[in-house]
Amino acid sequence: MNVLSYPPILDAISLVHLRKEVEYFYPLGYNKWIGKYDEPENTVERYILDSFDFLLSSQYPTAVGFEWWIENLDGHNTITLHSNHDDNYRKENGTLKYPLLSTELYLTNDIDPTTILDTKQGKYWEQYENNPPTEVVFSAPEEGKFIVSDPRYMRGVFGRCSSRTTLCYDVWDYKPKNLNRVGIVTKPFDVRFYKQEPSSPVQWLGKTKKMQLSINDQQFFKKFPNKYREGETWKVTQ
């Protein structure tokens, strides 16, 4: 699967500053935008621009900007299965367009993993490739951990109400309609990064549990590790 996991990429003080600002911004209401050559007005925008430049820019030279949002499980326990796509384009044209890459930065330690299926959404809303999935990646949060993945993969979170918080951005080669800057000006903290090498998910060979899910009214049981630790990333054959 096209999923890579980085060990914590931020030093402790940078993580504290970034998390504090994310908590201040939340809830956003709508996804936001920052252009590749825009001047950052806050620490969130600084992190997005600098992390892309530091970790990803050489692989995505056609990138023009970044759609970003905050995910938080406070008050609910599920982020339903979805792909990351240009939803405004879908509503206007009936087909789906996808970003170049999806990213997720964990701002808290937690046991509720990001679940990424190898089922991909296609050109049309009810079109799926490899449904039901044959492999599933489980990425357990750890402060500062960073994962990147194919935006077409169906993904979600299935856990419990908690303070689990992540900062996500997609890398685009055009600017989708109706995306704007957040418009909140703070003093951007100069976020500091560790040079980390990414790794692919490790194949899980231990005992598993099952959970029932559905895509497009097709139900299936996903197998997942019966126990794991914060920061681990596992791939489970279904």
Task: Name every feature range the model reports, one short phrase each.
Residues 115-117, 163-212, 219-224, 228-237:
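Double-stranded beta-helix
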Residues 5, 25, 38, 139, ...:
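Selective for proline/serine-rich intrinsically disordered segments
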Residues 1-69, 76-79, 184-190, 229-237:
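Non-heme Fe(II)/2-oxoglutarate
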Residues 1, 144, 206-208:
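Generic cytosolic/nucleocytoplasmic N-terminal low-complexity/intrinsically disordered segments
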Residues 62-191:
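Catalytic core of non-heme Fe(II) oxygenases with the double-stranded beta-helix
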